[in-house]
Swiss-Prot record:
Domain Brix: 1-157
Role this protein plays: Probably involved in the biogenesis of the ribosome.
Keywords: Ribosome biogenesis
Name of this chain's protein: Probable Brix domain-containing ribosomal biogenesis protein
GO molecular function terms noted in the UniProt entry: rRNA binding
Gene Ontology biological process terms from the UniProt entry: rRNA processing
Domain of life: Archaea
Length: 157
């Protein structure tokens, strides 16, 4: 899975791109002048996430399939924990928790193991969990919230 930025990303956008790639065990590149076809080539037959900006801040995620077709997009504002700088991301695939349209879209895109919200507390201590709700997407590690996306809009194509 490849995660990339808009063409001229701000430092905040690059930071979010790197965090997402570490969380979902994907690969992060800075887009530069690459077009969509070049990005699809870099994705090596896998899906693609493009982090877009709104007023210089990360504000949109576009989720593309391996052919470059936009599947869905998510508009958001972001929040980071003070612990994020010292957190070590294990090289494990995260699990997905949550209900609703966004959680369903994430399940079909990422193919992560999905668990019920009640089962999250029973996961091993180093587990990373993507908790997707209709208003908020919480990225947790070792039981702590690392960063969140406050959902402002969701659109399927």
């Amino acid at each position: 899975m490849l995660i990339t930025t808009s063409r001229k990303p701000s430092a905040k956008t690059r930071t979010l791109c790197k965090l997402l790639s570490r969380f979902i065990t994907g690969r992060c590149i800075t887009r530069g002048k690459m077009g969509m076809q070049e990005l699809i080539g870099f994705a090596e037959g896998g899906p693609l996430i493009v982090v877009g900006e709104y007023h210089g801040n990360p504000g949109e995620l576009g989720f593309y399939d391996d052919a470059g077709k936009l599947l869905f997009s998510l508009r958001f504002s972001d929040w980071y924990s003070e612990d994020i700088g010292s957190y070590w991301f294990p090289d494990l695939e995260p699990v997905l928790a949550g209900q609703g349209e966004i959680a369903d879209a994430f399940e079909s895109f990422f193919h992560f193991k999905r668990v019920e919200s009640e089962e999250v507390d029973q996961l091993p201590p180093l587990s990373t969990v993507l908790v997707a709700g209709e208003k908020e997407i919480d990225f947790t590690g070792s039981g702590k919230s690392l960063f969140k996306l406050n959902v402002k809009g969701f659109k399927k194509y």
